[in-house]
Amino acid sequence: MPQMMPMKWFLIYFIYLLIFYLFIMLINSMLIKTKINKETLKIKLKKWNWFW
């Protein structure tokens, strides 16, 4: 049993890293989308301010 423990922990750690990496990828894609949206929002706001 003690010899099996490190392997188990390694697997848990590996799965955790994989999930974390996927989560970072997801956040990055979301940030890119929001950046594009923010740029369009800024342009809209500038037009709106200019109109006022």
UniProtKB/Swiss-Prot annotation:
Ribonucleoprotein is among the record's keywords: no
Signal sequence coordinates: none
Residues annotated as transmembrane: 7-27
Location, primary (coarse class): mitochondrion
Topology versus the membrane: Single-pass membrane protein
Compartments in which it is found: Mitochondrion membrane
Entry's Gene Ontology BP terms: ATP biosynthetic process; proton transmembrane transport
Keywords: ATP synthesis, CF(0), Hydrogen ion transport, Ion transport, Membrane, Mitochondrion, Transmembrane, Transmembrane helix, Transport
Any one GO CC term of the record: proton-transporting ATP synthase complex
Coiled-coil residue windows: none
Assembly behavior: F-type ATPases have 2 components, CF(1) - the catalytic core - and CF(0) - the membrane proton channel.
Its job: Mitochondrial membrane ATP synthase (F(1)F(0) ATP synthase or Complex V) produces ATP from ADP in the presence of a proton gradient across the membrane which is generated by electron transport complexes of the respiratory chain. F-type ATPases consist of two structural domains, F(1) - containing the extramembraneous catalytic core and F(0) - containing the membrane proton channel, linked together by a central stalk and a peripheral stalk. During catalysis, ATP synthesis in the catalytic domain of F(1) is coupled via a rotary mechanism of the central stalk subunits to proton translocation.
Similarity-based family: Belongs to the ATPase protein 8 family.
Protein name: ATP synthase protein 8
Organism field: Apis mellifera ligustica
